[in-house]
């Protein structure tokens, strides 16, 4: 359980960034930060 939580925490943090928002897919595709 601890491994799963540790893996999801950074993902949730990245997806939760206001500067990325719903453009996460395009950001990951282009590999650029919208910030």
Curated annotation (Swiss-Prot):
Propeptide: 1-10, 19-35
GO molecular function, one term: toxin activity
Disulfide links within the chain: none
Cross-link type Cyclopeptide (Ile-Pro), residue numbers: 11-18
Pfam families given in the database record: Amanitin
Cited InterPro entries: Amanitin/phalloidin
Membership in a protein family: Belongs to the MSDIN fungal toxin family.
Protein name per its UniProtKB record: Cycloamanide F proprotein
